[in-house]
């Protein structure tokens, strides 16, 4: 070995010795792997559902100002959104707090002390009043002021890993806020269209009640004229009572829905006034294929992903704790035993200190912290894998439900058309003077009941479509 290579080797020897003296790191846990479902998921979907992803403000497609206003109020005033927003601000503040530890710090300090020296103590000579010896005891007023600086050198990347972990938490909280936003919007939309369904059903039931009252009035007139017996009108009276009971049930459901909407929109101070509107025909939206796109569109999966990234950075920080900590410190001060001498050049003092902390024996504390970090990371990965499977199942289940209800609506529409043809025939016979007007009412009642069934199916279809939009992430984009 020549002299040029000998001295660098000697210089590196203390560093190698320090690293060898660090507390040993034990690998006790095996990391889980993140699941990518694209290759395992059957992405075949009905052709009628392949119309593209929903927009992030998907509720605007209904062109309903009432619904838009309700959702906007919920997003602005709902306590859940306020909690989600505060969680983001807390995570951002925590990330900033960790990031500040990675830079130098400079402090200014000043102090003044009035003290009497003990003649019998270690500083006994200073208790004497001997100007020739430089002592003016026993009382002294000493002062110090100046700058102190410190810098923790993040050689092994511990602080950087902690900052990355905190930033991952911030991104996860932002995704959770978006998930809360979509859940709130979906809940408000579902309740709103359920109310509109009940309002439309209420109108149809009132029409049924009107036709039943027409039949009852006709039967009573025939009975009074001695043409029919009282028994023939009993069944109509019973049906009218059932219709009235259904109307009461519908009114009760509408009040419950209004109360729930008021709670979601934080609208308890004044009563909620809704105007009935026609139920829309919602076009189901789903991409041609699922897979990686699904992961990018679900806010809950993005939150789970960022929690995984954060946990991996936490592992890096736990590993970096096994290596030496190096700190640099410096000070520049004025220090004098008498205040009158404090600003003299001779009172100046300065210094630089380099400190090193080497973990050697810690009773397993560092390994325990590393095990905790790895366990939390594995838990985050397992939660992510579970969320992926559940997300794919949610989409498949919601898509199947939308398709099934779409087919039921088609069949119901045909049934309603057939029932209307029966009403048309009865009306024609009435116009020809063949039957009485009450018989037309009797023909209208089954058609109206089928219309009520159609409204319920249409409401179920709307509800399933909104659930499908939520399963697709509600148009969420990173």
Residue ranges and their predicted role:
Residues 2-76, 124-128, 167, 251-293, ...:
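Terminal intrinsically disordered/low-complexity segments used for targeting and assembly
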Residues 52, 60, 75-77, 97, ...:
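Amphipathic alpha-helical coiled-coil scaffold segments and their short linker/junction regions
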Residues 223-227, 430-434, 471-475:
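A short glycine-centered flexible hinge/capping loop motif at secondary-structure junctions
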Residues 71, 144-148, 192, 291, ...:
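Membrane-embedded beta-strand positions in outer-membrane beta-barrel channels/transporters
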Residues 67-69, 90, 142-144, 190, ...:
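Transmembrane beta-barrel architecture of outer-membrane proteins
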Residues 23, 175-290, 401, 405, ...:
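Periplasmic alpha-helical coiled-coil/stalk elements that build and connect Gram-negative outer-membrane
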Residues 82-83, 99, 139, 153-181, ...:
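Sec/SRP-type N-terminal targeting helices
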Residues 53-62, 109-148, 271-287, 316, ...:
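Small/polar, glycine/serine/threonine/aspartate-rich low-complexity segments that form flexible
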């Amino acid at each position: 070995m020549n002299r040029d290579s000998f001295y660098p080797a000697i210089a590196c020897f203390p560093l190698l010795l320090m690293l060898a003296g660090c507390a040993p790191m034990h690998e006790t846990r095996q990391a889980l792997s993140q699941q990518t479902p694209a290759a395992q998921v059957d992405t075949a979907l009905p052709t009628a559902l392949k119309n593209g992803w929903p927009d992030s403000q998907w509720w605007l497609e209904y062109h309903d100002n009432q619904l838009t206003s309700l959702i906007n109020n919920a997003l602005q005033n709902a306590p859940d959104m306020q909690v989600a927003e505060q969680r983001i601000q807390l995570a951002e503040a925590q990330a900033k707090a960790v990031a500040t530890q990675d830079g130098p710090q400079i402090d200014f300090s000043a102090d003044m002390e009035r003290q009497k020296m003990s003649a019998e103590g270690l500083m006994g000579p200073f208790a004497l009043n001997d100007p020739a010896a430089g002592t003016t005891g026993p009382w002294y007023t000493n002062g110090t002021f100046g700058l102190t600086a410190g810098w923790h050198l993040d050689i092994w990347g511990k602080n950087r890993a902690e900052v990355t972990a905190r930033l991952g938490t911030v991104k996860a909280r932002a995704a959770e806020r978006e998930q809360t936003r979509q859940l709130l919007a979906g809940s408000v939309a579902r309740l709103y269209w359920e109310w509109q369904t009940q309002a439309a059903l209420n109108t149809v039931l009132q029409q049924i009640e009107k036709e039943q009252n027409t039949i009852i009035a006709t039967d009573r007139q025939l009975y009074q004229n001695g043409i029919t017996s009282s028994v023939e009108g009993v069944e109509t009276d019973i049906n009218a009572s059932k219709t009235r009971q259904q109307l009461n049930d519908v009114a009760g459901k509408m009040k419950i829905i209004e109360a729930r909407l008021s709670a979601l929109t934080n609208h308890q101070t004044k009563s909620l006034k809704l105007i009935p509107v026609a139920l829309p025909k919602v076009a189901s939206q789903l991409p041609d294929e699922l897979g990686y796109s699904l992961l990018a569109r679900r806010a809950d999966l993005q939150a789970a992903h960022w929690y995984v990234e954060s946990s991996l950075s936490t592992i890096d920080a736990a590993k970096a704790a096994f290596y030496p900590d190096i700190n640099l410190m410096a000070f520049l001060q004025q220090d004098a035993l008498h205040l009158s001498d404090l600003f003299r050049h001779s009172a100046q003092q300065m210094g630089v200190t380099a400190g090193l902390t080497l973990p050697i024996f810690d009773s397993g504390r560092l390994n325990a912290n590393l095990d905790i970090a790895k366990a939390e990371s594995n838990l985050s990965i397992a939660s992510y894998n579970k969320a992926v499977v559940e997300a794919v199942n949610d989409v498949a289940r919601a898509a199947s439900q939308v398709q099934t209800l779409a087919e039921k609506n088609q069949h119901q529409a045909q049934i309603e058309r057939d029932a209307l043809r029966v009403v048309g025939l009865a009306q024609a016979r009435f116009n020809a003077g063949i039957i009485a007007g009450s018989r037309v009412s009797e023909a209208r009642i089954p058609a109206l009941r089928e219309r009520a069934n159609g409204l319920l199916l249409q409401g179920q279809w709307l509800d399933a479509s909104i659930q499908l939009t939520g399963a697709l992430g509600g148009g969420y984009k990173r």
